UniProtKB/Swiss-Prot annotation:
PROSITE patterns: ATPASE_C
InterPro entries: ATP_synth_csu_bac/chlpt, ATP_synth_F0_csu, ATP_synth_F0_csu_DDCD_BS, ATP_synth_F0_csu_sf, ATPase_proteolipid_c-like_dom, F/V-ATP_Csub_sf
Annotated family: Belongs to the ATPase C chain family.
Annotated site, Reversibly protonated during proton transport, chain positions: 54
Keyword Ion transport: yes
Membrane-topology annotation of the record: Multi-pass membrane protein
Protein name (record): ATP synthase subunit c
Quaternary structure, from the entry: F-type ATPases have 2 components, F(1) - the catalytic core - and F(0) - the membrane proton channel. F(1) has five subunits: alpha(3), beta(3), gamma(1), delta(1), epsilon(1). F(0) has three main subunits: a(1), b(2) and c(10-14). The alpha and beta chains form an alternating ring which encloses part of the gamma chain. F(1) is attached to F(0) by a central stalk formed by the gamma and epsilon chains, while a peripheral stalk is formed by the delta and b chains.
GO CC terms of this entry: plasma membrane; proton-transporting ATP synthase complex; proton-transporting two-sector ATPase complex, proton-transporting domain
Species: Priestia megaterium (strain ATCC 12872 / QMB1551) (Bacillus megaterium)
Name of the coding gene: atpE
Domain of life where this protein originates: Bacteria
Keyword list, A-Z: ATP synthesis, Cell membrane, CF(0), Hydrogen ion transport, Ion transport, Lipid-binding, Membrane, Transmembrane, Transmembrane helix, Transport
């Protein structure tokens, strides 16, 4: 049962991160197209946002390993 729960947790975290990253990047491209002079600021903010979104799947993997180890 723990193996199935781990797989579901990792899969949903990866799905959410993929959707979140897609939204972040698309809005950054949209903002750059509207205001090209803000490209540097938008890009740096995009990388911060992507890093925060990617932290959740990493935490999910750690928790999944903890559930499997019990």
């Amino acid at each position: 049962m723990g193996l199935i729960a781990s797989a579901i947790a990792i899969g949903l975290a990866a799905l959410g991160a993929g959707i979140g990253n897609g939204l972040i990047v698309s809005k950054t491209i949209e903002g750059t197209a509207r205001q090209p002079e803000a490209r540097g600021t938008l890009t740096s903010m995009m990388f911060v946002g992507v890093a925060l979104v990617e932290a959740l799947p990493i935490i999910a993997v750690v928790i999944a390993f903890m559930v499997q180890g019990k």
